[in-house]
From Swiss-Prot:
Species in which this protein is naturally found: Citrobacter koseri (strain ATCC BAA-895 / CDC 4225-83 / SGSC4696)
UniProt-recorded name of the protein: Phosphoribosylaminoimidazole-succinocarboxamide synthase
Keyword Ligase: yes
Gene Ontology MF terms in the entry: ATP binding; phosphoribosylaminoimidazolesuccinocarboxamide synthase activity
CDD domains: SAICAR_synt_PurC
Entry's EC annotation: 6.3.2.6
Entry's Gene Ontology cellular component terms: cytosol
Entries under PANTHER family matching the protein: MULTIFUNCTIONAL PROTEIN ADE2, SI:DKEY-6E2.2
Keyword terms, alphabetized: ATP-binding, Ligase, Nucleotide-binding, Purine biosynthesis
Pfam families cross-referenced by the UniProt entry: SAICAR_synt (PF01259)
Gene behind the chain: purC
Family: Belongs to the SAICAR synthetase family.
InterPro entries from the UniProt entry: SAICAR_synt/ADE2_N, SAICAR_synt_PurC, SAICAR_synth, SAICAR_synthetase, SAICAR_synthetase_CS
Biological processes annotated in GO: 'de novo' IMP biosynthetic process; cobalamin biosynthetic process
Length: 237
């Protein structure tokens, strides 16, 4: 399947059309951003690592019964995916306190959250992805009540699957975001799952193994991503 016209260029991925109107090519670039795109740097191998990482995770989620847009890997940095009508709201699950939750509530980082918290954010960089709720979604017509309920159900199911997967690899799944879309009327998991959109800590040391290494200028970003991938069993080379 050959990529054709560039349809969308995000902060770290580019989307291309194909000869099949129902399929797209998703290309992972080496770009890494923070501050809603205010700071961007390039890291060798990052596109490759995130592409293969994402394919691995999406495969695990599909095996658990979660519908995903993933079709197949095409190259080190590209995959073939279903074309979704994306919902403009992202779902976030928090198993431990970190990031904006700590700032917003003034609580200690790392506190376990039981049951996990579920948040919704409007995907809008210019507005810094404001937090919203189901009432906003219904009033502004972003997603139907039924489809939002399905998104929440699938997000919690993904959390159950991924918490165990990462725990078995000696990692804590602190939090993560998921994006969904509609494919022929069905709610389907889209976009990506990688250390760019999740927080992962080492169980023993609590070292951060995700994009917080870039946000907080800790260094060793790609080394951390590759360590996580290899612990999970992702074939990088």
């Amino acid at each position: 399947m050959q990529k054709q016209a560039e349809l969308y260029r995000g902060k770290a991925k580019t989307v291309y059309s194909t000869e099949n109107p129902d399929l797209l090519v998703l290309e992972f670039r080496n770009d890494t951003s923070a501050g809603d795109g205010a700071r961007i740097e390039q890291f060798d191998r990052k596109g490759m690592v995130n592409n293969k990482f994402n394919h691995f995770i999406m495969t695990k989620l599909a095996e658990a019964g979660i519908p995903t847009q993933m079709e197949q890997l095409l190259s080190d940095t590209e995959c073939l995916v279903k074309k979704l009508d994306m919902v403009p709201v992202e779902c976030v699950v928090r198993n431990r306190a970190a990031g904006s939750l700590v700032k917003r509530l003034g609580i200690e980082e790392g506190i376990e959250l039981n049951p996990p918290l579920f948040d919704l954010f409007l995907k809008n960089d210019a507005m810094h992805d404001p937090m919203v709720n189901d009432s906003y979604c219904e009033t502004f017509g972003w997603v139907s009540k039924e489809n939002l309920a399905r998104m929440k159900e699938l997000t919690y199911k993904a959390n159950d699957v991924l918490k165990k997967l990462f725990d078995d690899a000696g990692l804590i799944l602190v939090d993560f975001k998921l994006e969904f879309g509609l494919y022929k009327g069905e709610v389907v998991l889209g976009d990506e799952f990688s250390p760019d959109g999740s927080r992962l800590w080492d169980k023993e040391t609590l070292d951060k193994m995700d994009k917080d290494r870039f946000r907080q200028s800790l260094g060793g970003l790609i080394e951390a991503y590759e360590t996580v991938a290899r612990r999970l069993g992702v074939q990088l080379d």
